[in-house]
């Protein structure tokens, strides 16, 4: 048992290359992600067919490892403070097609297949279902959002039942 634990620890701590030079980070062949002070890296997720942005989330070291190995999106939920296998509750699993990392390895872009499903806990295909109008802002009025997606893919009350809403005020 002790050997298995040590083997796992060795694998987990050596999965990503240590950041030792700017050249290696920018031009090197090894994954050396830069996690923030909370141990997170931002992830923008897009639909592999349409190119639409589906969501913005975060991964920690463990969720990135699970995503790579399972080929299904696993994020770090900041609201629940836990690993979040996307679609485990709703059934709308994100099948990973590609993961890219930016030039200084501090942000991820992931393309996924969601079939005919959705990525937003509100029920829309994308978490970016509203648009902010451009132009002159009238200081006496509030900026009104424009809905770009009209129809929800599912009813969140039926899917999530008694689970708490992750949106915080």
Role assignments for model-derived ranges:
Residues 45-48:
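Short, acidic, Ser/Thr-enriched surface-loop or helix-capping motifs
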Residues 16-40, 59-66, 71-169:
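C-terminal binding/interaction regions
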Residues 5-7, 11:
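Short, positively charged and aromatic/hydrophobic N-terminal segments
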């Amino acid at each position: 048992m002790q050997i298995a634990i040590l083997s796992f620890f060795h694998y987990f701590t050596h999965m990503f290359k240590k950041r030792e030079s700017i050249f290696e980070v920018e031009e090197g062949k090894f994954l050396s992600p830069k996690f923030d002070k909370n141990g997170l890296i931002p992830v923008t997720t897009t639909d592999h067919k349409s190119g639409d942005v589906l969501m913005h989330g975060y991964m920690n070291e463990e969720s990135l490892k699970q995503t790579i190995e399972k080929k299904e999106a696993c994020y770090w939920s900041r609201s629940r403070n836990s690993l979040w296998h996307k679609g485990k509750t709703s059934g709308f699993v994100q099948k990973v097609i590609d993961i890219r990392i930016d030039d200084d390895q501090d942000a991820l872009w992931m393309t996924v297949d969601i079939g005919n499903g959705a990525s937003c806990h509100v029920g829309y295909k994308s978490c970016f279902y509203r648009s902010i109008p451009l132009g002159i802002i009238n200081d006496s009025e509030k900026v009104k959002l424009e809905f770009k997606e009209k129809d929800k893919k599912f009813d969140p009350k039926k899917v999530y039942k008694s689970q708490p809403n992750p949106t915080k005020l």
